Swiss-Prot record:
One of its GO terms (molecular function) is hydrolase activity. This is Zinc metalloproteinase-disintegrin-like botrocetin. The keyword Secreted applies. Ca(2+) binds at V6, N9, L11, E13, E16, D19. It comes from Bothrops jararaca.
Length: 25
């Protein structure tokens, strides 16, 4: 299953700079 990068799903996906929260956190 290919899903778009989601910030806060505890997974560092391609193109993401965060992996466990919002960029503000």
């Amino acid at each position: 299953i290919i899903s778009p990068p989601v910030c806060g799903n505890e997974l560092l996906e391609e193109g993401e700079e965060c992996d466990c929260g919002t960029p503000e956190n």
